[in-house]
């Protein structure tokens, strides 16, 4: 009788242990399901979050002699902040501001506003204060004060916290990283290219041009744009080409800019004609890509009064932002 009662107690204890183990296993299983569900919900919510970035860009910052005279102070210094008085509030609304500085900044050369462009260092303070983050230097005037002037221009911008593109000193172009800006968690690659350098490239060796400048070599452009497509979320191209003062893009512009879209570009901000040219939305792989063939001038002294003989002179006073 006693053995029977002891056996019953042992069985009851065994059952309790088994039930406890089953409950523990079920509890752990339920906890694991909750953790997995929570992770899935977090991933789902993260994937559903829309990230946005406001990018602003404009046409040429073209500093003619008249702008130097208006910026000259009594002590002989230059203050260019007034140039941006009315647009600064707009620029400050952007998450990323891109510009095109069409000239050079070389302290070893005199100031010049045409046909060669060379501005004082103080111009960069005004540009930075206005809100610019990136400045395109791939244009036909970047050699106006020599290759050294291209380097000093890039350095002047870097000193005030603006990233230059289109000029490479060290490392050289083929070894340089792409400029990719993190904007609200979105990786934005910015590249720029120039159609030529007003013949001043003839003063350089082919190697110097290849190492330090960014021209419209299709093979190299394709490689860099495809690389940007892999490394960034958005790819912005700022090419300089076309015909000055022409209100429509050339066939060459249209063809090349569409190639850039095919290679991976998402946005193309064109420049050089000094007048605004049409924009176009291109559909690729179910997405919309933007082309502005020319953004015109943003700061310059090109206007009706100074553009004798140019039928589209009035349009030099207009630009895109």
PLM features per residue range, with description:
Residues 2-321:
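Acidic, metal/ion-coordinating pockets
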């Amino acid at each position: 009788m006693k053995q029977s009662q002891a056996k019953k107690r042992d069985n009851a204890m065994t059952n309790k242990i088994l039930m406890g183990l089953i409950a523990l296993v079920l509890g752990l299983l339920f906890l694991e399901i909750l953790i997995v569900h929570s992770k899935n919900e977090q991933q789902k919510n993260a994937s559903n979050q829309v990230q946005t970035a406001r990018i602003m860009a404009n046409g040429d910052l073209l500093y003619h002699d008249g702008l130097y005279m208006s910026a000259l102070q009594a002590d002989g210094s230059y203050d260019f902040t007034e140039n941006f008085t009315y647009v600064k509030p707009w620029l400050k609304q952007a998450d990323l501001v891109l510009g095109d500085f069409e000239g050079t900044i070389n302290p070893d050369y005199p100031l010049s506003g045409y046909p060669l462009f060379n501005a004082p260092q103080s111009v960069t303070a005004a540009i930075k204060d206005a809100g610019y983050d990136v400045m395109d230097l791939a244009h036909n005037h970047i050699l106006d004060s020599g290759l050294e002037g291209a380097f000093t221009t890039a350095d002047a911008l870097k000193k005030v916290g603006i990233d230059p593109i289109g000029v490479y000193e060290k490392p050289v172009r083929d070894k340089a990283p792409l400029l990719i800006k993190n904007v609200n968690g979105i990786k934005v690659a910015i590249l720029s290219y120039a159609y030529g350098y007003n013949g001043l490239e003839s003063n350089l060796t082919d190697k110097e041009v290849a190492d330090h400048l960014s021209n419209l070599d299709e093979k190299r452009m394709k490689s860099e744009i495809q690389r940007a497509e892999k490394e960034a979320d958005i790819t912005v191209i700022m090419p300089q080409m076309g015909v000055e003062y022409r209100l429509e893009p050339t066939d060459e512009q249209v063809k090349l800019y569409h190639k850039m879209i095919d290679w991976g570009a998402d946005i193309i901000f064109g420049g050089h004609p000094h007048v605004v040219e049409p924009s176009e939305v291109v559909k690729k792989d179910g997405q919309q890509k933007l082309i502005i063939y020319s953004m015109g001038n943003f700061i310059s002294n090109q206007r009706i009064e100074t553009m004798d003989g140019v039928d589209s002179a009035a349009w030099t006073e207009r630009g895109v932002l």
